[in-house]
Amino acid sequence: MVLMGVVLPLCMTALPARADLTLPVTSPAARFSPATWAGDAGRGGAVSRRTWNNGAWCVWHWSTPSPHPTARLQITNQTPGSAVSYFLDGALTDDVPVPASGGIPIAGLAAPGPHTLTVYTRNSPQTDRWRGTNAYTVTGLTLDDGAKPTPAPPLRHWVLIVGDSITEGIQADDGRDSSLCDYAFLVGQGLNAAGFDYTVSACGYSGWVRPGDAQGDVPAYLPLLGVQRWNMIDADTRLLDSRGHLSAYGGIGQEPAAILLNYGVNECLNHSDKAAMRDSVISVLTALRRAAPRTEITVLVPPGLADTRIYPNGPAYITALHAAVAAYQAAHPDDRKTVLVDLGPDVARALGSPAYGGGVHPHAAGHAYLAPLILQAVLSRIP
């Protein structure tokens, strides 16, 4: 402003800087799927959570007064080709690439009020996952100024689903990889509706004695020699608590209500020694029972294995699985919480039909056909 030839400064009130809120991974508003995430300090730490498991999830709850809310999930993966899918207040955004930096802006926020974001690790290349080179890392959720966290519901009784490429959703999206199209996800939604949480620990190429990932970097579930996977989340993080029990987050008293084991396909495809597989099954069941004394354990005969059009040697491996579980039960007659479930040859032939995929990996319709059968098998065992 100019007055009598003198330039006077304009008096202006500075606008306050925008102060976005970032919820850390330790926020009460956040919850991570049990038994599948490692932290920056063992199972915990205040900085980050990471997982290589497709099908793992995290959920965030908050409320905002803003008519134009924003949210950005602080997630990265250094390996190209990985993706997540998320549900915002029930609406699905599918197949979102995970960047090497910068996180993912959440689409669809359009109104004030309470919001819930559930993020699923959808797919990643089957390589370098065990040592964290190919892992999703989450450091928080950044929200608009004025947003406030709201508490996430506590962990409920939970179910651990273990398996191979079929369980992690390879080719499940009608030829494309997606953990949201596989039976494990669908069984998980049924478990949620029945009042349970769930988690998926699955790796392609793996089995009772077969290592996982294309180059074999993920250990077999329990080989007779070498590194085991049953009691680890990744190469550096144990799945057990201080007592040696399976634990959702590392605390005592967090054992799963049930475990479903779906292995044997890769042993069959690779002509693995059936006696070695049998011994591994017995060792797995013995170890799991020691680490989860009251948990319902179900060994599932891989549902397609009886179809000799796809698995010429399938019946021999089915026989080996039956024999292994029978041998364990004979040695542990008081353990009535460990069973084998065989859905039978009709289910196998259905999965082998072209409409359901017609091969080793079912398509979405095949997984949808399979899911209620497996869900019933799991729920029928839980008191």
Which ranges hold each PLM region?
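Active-site segments of SGNH/GDSL-like serine hydrolases
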Residues: 260-269, 284-318
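A short beta-strand element within beta-rich, extracytoplasmic domains
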Residues: 65-80
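Glycan-recognition and processing domains
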Residues: 18-60
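Short, surface-exposed beta-strand/strand-loop-strand elements in extracellular ectodomains
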Residues: 81-92
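Serine-esterase "nucleophile elbow" of acetyl-processing enzymes
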Residues: 115, 140-214
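Catalytic His-Asp segment of secreted/periplasmic serine-dependent ester chemistry enzymes
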Residues: 216, 303-383
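Short, well-structured beta-strand segments within conserved domains
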Residues: 69-73, 102-134
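Oxyanion-hole/transition-state-stabilizing segment in secreted/luminal serine hydrolases
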Residues: 168, 217-278, 303-305
